Amino acid sequence: MPKIAEEARAARRDQIIAAAAECFTRSGYHVTTMADIAEAAGVSKGTPYLYFPGKEALFIALYEEWDCALAARVDAAVGELPEPARGSPRVVLAAVASAIAAHVTGNPQTCRVLMEATTLAAYEPAIAATVRTADAASLGQLTGLFQAGIAAGQWPPGTDPALQARLFTAGLYGLMAQWHTAPGSFSLETAMAALAGTGAAGPSGDGGNSQAKGTGT
């Protein structure tokens, strides 16, 4: 396929995904139809099917696109830390939380749609598999971060790193859900900074507190 044709196809695919995000935000997953998405994208009713077999596949593509963009934002934030700070699990955790907050507040439409994924995962097997894959990768990285922090004395000995990763993730999801339910009622950046500052297992002396202050927003 010629390069120009490939670029045009990629652009049209992105156009359809953006239209899907708009429709899912406005009407929800179940009410939205492929015809709605086609209309929002300004294409014929059959065009979305040239790129996606159905609405579920389109939703999954949207989820994966958001997940990749979020991962890139987090990786960039951690990569920008100076070398000494990058070696501190608590500082890295704060950078992760800050990057997630910035991404969510900067992309409220898409993120609001994808909050629905956790509900859809209960009864849509393909969506569930996608969400589980993304969660497993995130939990694995967070577990490793907590393991390093425990070894460095930044969290108490005997702390379960896998459990703390789940608790931290639950805190992030909970804050995002509250922020989307009542936009403007609180600062998501400040709340996530506080979550990272205390850590799922609680603060650990001056090291945890000073790092939280240094990375709060």
Please annotate each region the language model reported:
Residues Q15, A19-A57, A61:
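Helix-turn-helix
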Residues A129-D135, A151-L167, E189-T190:
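All-alpha amphipathic helical-bundle segments outside canonical DNA-binding/catalytic cores
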Residues V91, A95-A102, L139-G140, G144-A152, ...:
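C-terminal peripheral helix-coil segments that are non-catalytic and often amphipathic
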Residues A61, D75-T110, P161, A165-F168, ...:
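Hydrophobic alpha-helical connector segments
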Residues Q109-T110, T130-A137, G144:
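Short, solvent-exposed amphipathic helices
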Residues E64-L70:
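Short, basic, alpha-helical segments at the C-terminal edge of helix-turn-helix-like DNA-binding modules
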Residues V104-A129:
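Amphipathic alpha-helical segments used for helix-helix packing
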